[in-house]
Amino acid sequence: MISESLLLVFLIVFISASLLKLLFVRENKPKAHLKNPPSPPAIPIIGHLHLLKPLIHHSFRDLSLRYGPLLSLRIGSVKFIVASTPSLAQEFLKTNELTYSSRKMNMAINMVTYHNATFAFAPYDTYWKFMKKLSTTELLGNKTLGHFLPIRTREVHDIIQFLFHKSKAQESVNLTEALLSLSNNVISQMMLSIKSSGTDSQAEQARTLVREVTQIFGEFNVSDFLGFCKNLDLQGFRKRALDIHKRYDALLEKIISDREELRRKSKVDGCEDGDDEKVKDFLDILLDVAEQKECEVQLTRNHVKSLILDYFTAATDTTAISVEWTIAELFNNPKVLKKAQEEVDRVTGNTQLVCEADIPNLPYIHAIIKETMRLHPPIPMIMRKGIEDCVVNGNMIPKGSIVCVNIWAMGRDPNIWKNPLEFKPERFLEGEGSAIDTKGHHFELLPFGSGRRGCPGMPLAMRELPTIIGALIQCFEWKMLGSQGEILDHGRSLISMDERPGLTAPRANDLIGIPVARLNPTPFRQM
């Protein structure tokens, strides 16, 4: 029989434990009383899937206009939080940066990028930090970019010569494809020392694969959002992703094996240090790091392959897309084009082709690039995955939510920009706008993201964009063709500015036109 004293002790312990549990729960759930962001009515199982159109960032903007700048959506079983103001962007990307420093991987990304070997979609951990440091100091540092200046210069010269020959023949050019070839040639030479020349070349294969990768990464796969469909390949994504992965892996395996054999031969010949003048490409740098046994992170073969894919994907599409949008906007805004040409003519004297050394003297070209990226950011939304519960503007944001900062919508918001749909580069040269840059410090303009996960390729992009755009408008006018092949009346007929879906935000239709030489002969610098 239990004594009264023992029963009393038991009761005291029970009551104390209950009180402690109650206090613990209350202490650890201080956010339970907080409101959730507004949300449209949902349908069981699919959530808000029925409200989305192919251009997701457009759909998110339309819903935000109705329900507010902080919006909660459920796509199947996945919760999305849409943020559409600079202050909210700052909350997620700066104030709570560590909470939102990871990304969600879908099935296609996971399969194509060697599962956990990717850098672009890796969680914010030791591996990611190491790769970010390697990218910013070695792969895309000022010294490395300086070494590759002759490659970038030569590629700009090549496209100008190509367009000049087309101009003499009065032949049309698919500028979309030409710009993709240019950006692919630059990054493939920087990474692998190969250049696209003919349909059977390694760089050409890589370019084809990159376009397939960006397409499948940006497409909607129902299996990523509906749990009961996870193991069902209803849309054939798994089959496509596996095919892309196999072809890419075979291509990279051949390139890496050939390079390793060349490195072994150099060591046997006693040339392992190479010529002091020899510039190492990205692959050599990565293989050097992989061979370091005492390295902070041991790079595997899959790490090397995945990183090359990350950079091919990022550098090929986004640069070409930004130049293409810029040329389209300049055609539709002839006064802006004329002013830009006058600036380039003044700086170069039309005796030499614009080059990277001229960039500091081209403020209007810089303003044009900012204005293009305001209206047409190459990546329309910054997406982050929350690793813990967070409170933003008095709203409870649950752990695991996918936060989408809709930078495309912010660029067109009349509460942020005066006459937002007008293409007016002067807004970045006058008043407060003159202080706005693209480095992620000004949350109304985030074409390269912000903070730790900001795009490491920004220094390369901001060398290429002014030079390519400057050279194109310095050397040519354009007779642009419409959807039916008709020549558009410059100043009256406008190029369509429709978009198509994808990981990036490209134009819906290829940009095709007949180049008309402004300068004859075309000026070239000595290489």
Swiss-Prot record:
Record-annotated membrane-spanning stretches: 5-25
Main subcellular location of this protein, as a coarse class: membrane
Binding site for heme: 455
GO biological process: flavone biosynthetic process; luteolin biosynthetic process
Top EC group: oxidoreductase
InterPro entries: Cyt_P450 (IPR001128), Cyt_P450_CS (IPR017972), Cyt_P450_E_grp-I (IPR002401), Cyt_P450_sf (IPR036396)
Domain of life of the source: Eukaryota
pH dependence: Optimum pH is 7.9.
Activity relative to temperature: Optimum temperature is 25 degrees Celsius.
Catalytic reaction list: a flavanone + reduced [NADPH--hemoprotein reductase] + O2 = a flavone + oxidized [NADPH--hemoprotein reductase] + 2 H2O + H(+)
Pathways involved: Secondary metabolite biosynthesis; flavonoid biosynthesis
Keywords of this entry: Flavonoid biosynthesis, Heme, Iron, Membrane, Metal-binding, Monooxygenase, Oxidoreductase, Transmembrane, Transmembrane helix
UniProt-listed Pfam families: p450 (PF00067)
Membrane topology recorded in Swiss-Prot or TrEMBL: Single-pass membrane protein
GO cellular component terms, semicolon-separated: membrane
PANTHER family tied to this protein: CYTOCHROME P450, CYTOCHROME P450 93A3-LIKE
Protein function: Functions as a flavone synthase II (FNSII) that catalyzes the direct conversion of flavanones to flavones. In vitro, can convert liquiritigenin, naringenin and eriodictyol to 7,4'-dihydroxyflavone, apigenin and luteolin, respectively.
Membership in a protein family: Belongs to the cytochrome P450 family.
Protein name, per record: Cytochrome P450 93B16
